[in-house]
């Protein structure tokens, strides 16, 4: 039997070598052997060491000993501003890799580690100080962390402050620099039970020193999310505040908030705006609501489901109280949802149902002037428009009444509509023809006109359409392609295709993104996929699944109240009107979205 050939190379490594080497160096230091430099700390105390160890442990010493300065050759180096006990700890760490951080040494050790460039020790001190955060030191700790570029500690301090802002003393908050206060007010994580508390925080800061701070009031008010301040408070306190009444920029912000609450502000048509995003602590969230549709067996659904993108969870809302039928249209007006028309196959409906999100209830409102199916509905300037081939009418929710308008100049079958830049657009094929056109309604003139928008994309039939950030998006029913029209520039464009087709699916805008759900996919299987398009990244991603595969459903987005995310306990400061809305020690009922409107 042949013996195996001897190995030419035997790879070997000793896992304990690094630790053994450290121990050896530490022993040489203790025996004062081969020492080639002495560090002199503040107060004149000497620390003998090895240059190679210091240079390997710290970029500061590496640069010092490798450069052309006098210290590179000196046997004695004086370190200004480094306490001897802190230098002792850092030298011990260089030879052992260990250091004991405590409440007595954490801050001075961090300063020394920052100066002498021991990043691991600096990070350990920051982690220790994070555990020491409390109401008495959080503001100073954030100052300290930012002064020494401790990102982790600075971030932890800010999170602590935002979460406990209602428990901080008034004097602490009033001493904040402007930039810091603006940062807190603009942060989604500012933990207030109601937006009125954020407004009061800004107002109290200005009132603490009016001569110096009044000029900053418009900037502060812009950082408050006035649209989510309750209407009675907006009228009784914000509008009556002299700082607001005498300031045109503040009055514009107030008007914006009132338009939003009266459903006259289309947040989807405008560009992204933080003021239109409620803080999670208030319990309000923008949600996707699905109404009706058909299931796998083509059975009609009367369920109403809502999806909260913050939690990724679905919840049931009040079921539709009647037979939905087919051919109905769904639209959101403010925080309410309207379902118009439809048919049961033999009879057209003129009925209109309103979902009141504040009480989770469906009620019937004034019927349309004409019964219809396969029409389209959109909201423009706080009014609900219903558009069909031969007629157009408009609903005013403040008077619960309908008004007949001029019909389209060129009747279109089964059109899609969307409001954009103050006008209503309709897209579809001319009645009895295959020619696709786009028409525009001018509300100030009660007039329809044909839009000369060049060659339309090759749609087989009217695509689903929504408006986002001043652009009109068109989702094809038989393709994953997505077209975009800019009415201001009169230009067409494409965005990346969806991950799949959604034949019979639904389209909505939520949180500055397009949401497409359900329908039949590329394999003709009924899908439960919900995918979203983010204009900032120009990418589609699957964000969830429907409760069950569904098609021919409607979807819209509204704001709805969920459980507030404010921490319990602690004191706060009183709001105008005598109620301590920052005092979260007592449970409170959730905010009613109807109060906004």
Curated annotation (Swiss-Prot):
Residues 570-597 are annotated as: Disordered. Pathway: Protein modification; protein ubiquitination. GO terms for molecular function: ubiquitin-like ligase-substrate adaptor activity. Kelch repeats lie at residues 287-335, 336-382, 384-422, 424-463, 464-512, 513-560. It is found in: Cytoplasm, Cytoskeleton, Spindle. Keywords: Cell cycle, Cell division, Cytoplasm, Cytoskeleton, Kelch repeat, Mitosis, Repeat, Ubl conjugation pathway. It comes from the Eukaryota. GO terms for cellular component: Cul3-RING ubiquitin ligase complex; cytoplasm; polar microtubule. Residues 138-239 form the BACK domain. The keyword Repeat applies. GO terms for biological process: cell division; chromosome passenger complex localization to spindle midzone; proteasome-mediated ubiquitin-dependent protein catabolic process; protein ubiquitination; regulation of cytokinesis. The keyword Cell cycle applies. Gene3D superfamilies: 1.25.40.420, Kelch-type beta propeller, Potassium Channel Kv1.1, Chain A. It holds the Pfam family BTB. Residues 587-597 have a biased composition (Pro residues). Residues 35-103 form the BTB domain. Component of the BCR(KLHL21) E3 ubiquitin ligase complex, at least composed of CUL3, KLHL21 and RBX1. Substrate-specific adapter of a BCR (BTB-CUL3-RBX1) E3 ubiquitin-protein ligase complex required for efficient chromosome alignment and cytokinesis. The BCR(KLHL21) E3 ubiquitin ligase complex regulates localization of the chromosomal passenger complex (CPC) from chromosomes to the spindle midzone in anaphase and mediates the ubiquitination of AURKB. Ubiquitination of AURKB by BCR(KLHL21) E3 ubiquitin ligase complex may not lead to its degradation by the proteasome. This is Kelch-like protein 21. It comes from Bos taurus (Bovine). The lineage of its organism: Eukaryota, Metazoa, Chordata, Craniata, Vertebrata.
């Amino acid at each position: 039997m042949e013996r195996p050939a001897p190995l030419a190379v035997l790879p070997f490594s000793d896992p304990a070598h690094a630790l053994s080497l450290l121990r050896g160096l530490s022993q040489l230091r203790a025996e004062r052997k081969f020492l080639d430099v002495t560090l002199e700390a503040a107060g004149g105390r000497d620390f003998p060491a090895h240059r190679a160890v210091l240079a390997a442990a710290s970029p500061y010493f590496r640069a010092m000993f490798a450069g052309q300065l006098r210290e590179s050759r000196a046997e004695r180096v004086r370190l200004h501003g480094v306490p001897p006990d802190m230098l002792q700890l850092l030298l011990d760490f260089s030879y052992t890799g260990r250091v004991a951080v405590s409440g007595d040494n954490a801050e001075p050790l961090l300063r020394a580690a920052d100066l002498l460039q021991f990043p691991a020790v600096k990070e350990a001190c920051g982690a220790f100080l994070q555990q020491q955060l409390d109401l008495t030191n959080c503001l100073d700790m954030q100052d300290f962390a930012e002064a020494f570029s401790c990102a982790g500690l600075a971030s932890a301090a800010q999170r602590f402050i935002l979460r406990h802002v209602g428990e901080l003393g008034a004097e602490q908050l009033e001493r904040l620099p402007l930039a810091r206060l603006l940062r807190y007010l603009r942060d989604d994580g500012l933990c207030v039970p109601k937006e009125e508390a954020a407004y009061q925080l800004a107002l109290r800061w200005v009132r603490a020193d009016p001569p110096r701070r009044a000029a900053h009031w418009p900037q502060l008010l812009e950082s408050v999310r006035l649209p989510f301040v309750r209407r009675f408070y907006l009228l009784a306190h914000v509008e009556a505040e002299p700082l607001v009444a005498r300031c045109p920029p503040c009055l514009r912000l107030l008007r914006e908030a009132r338009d939003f609450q009266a459903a006259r502000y289309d947040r989807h048509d405008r560009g992204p705006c933080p003021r239109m995003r409620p803080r999670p602590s208030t319990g309000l969230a923008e949600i996707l609501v699905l109404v009706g549709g058909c299931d796998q067996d083509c059975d009609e659904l009367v369920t109403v489901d809502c999806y909260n993108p913050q939690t990724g969870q679905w919840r049931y809302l009040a079921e539709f109280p009647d037979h939905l039928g087919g051919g109905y249209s769904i639209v959101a007006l403010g925080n309410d949802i309207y379902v118009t028309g439809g048919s049961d196959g033999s009879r057209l409906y003129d009925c209109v149902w309103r979902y009141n999100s504040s009480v989770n209830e469906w009620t019937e409102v004034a019927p349309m002037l004409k019964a219809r199916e396969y029409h389209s509905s959109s909201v423009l300037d706080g009014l609900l428009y219903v558009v069909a081939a031969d007629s157009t009418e408009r609903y005013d929710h403040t008077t619960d009444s309908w008004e007949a308008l001029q019909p389209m100049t060129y009747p279109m079958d089964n059109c899609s509509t969307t409001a954009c830049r103050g006008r209503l657009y309709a897209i579809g094929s001319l009645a009895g023809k295959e020619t696709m056109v786009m028409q525009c309604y001018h509300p100030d003139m009660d007039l329809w006109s044909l839009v000369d928008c060049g060659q339309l994309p090759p749609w087989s039939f009217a695509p689903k359409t929504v408006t986002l950030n001043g652009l009109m998006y068109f989702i094809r029913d038989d393709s994953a392609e997505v077209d975009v029209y800019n009415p201001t520039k009169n230009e067409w464009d494409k965005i990346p295709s969806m991950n799949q087709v959604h034949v019979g699916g639904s389209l909505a805008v939520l949180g500055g993104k397009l949401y497409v759900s359900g329908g039949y996919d590329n394999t003709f299987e009924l899908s439960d996929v919900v995918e979203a398009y983010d204009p900032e990244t120009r990418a589609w991603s699957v964000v969830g699944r429907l409760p069950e595969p569904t098609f021919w459903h409607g979807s819209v987005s509204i704001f709805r109240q969920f459980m507030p995310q404010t921490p319990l306990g602690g004191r706060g400061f009183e709001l105008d009107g005598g109620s301590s809305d920052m005092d979260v020690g007592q449970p409170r009922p959730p905010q009613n979205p109807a109060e906004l409107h």
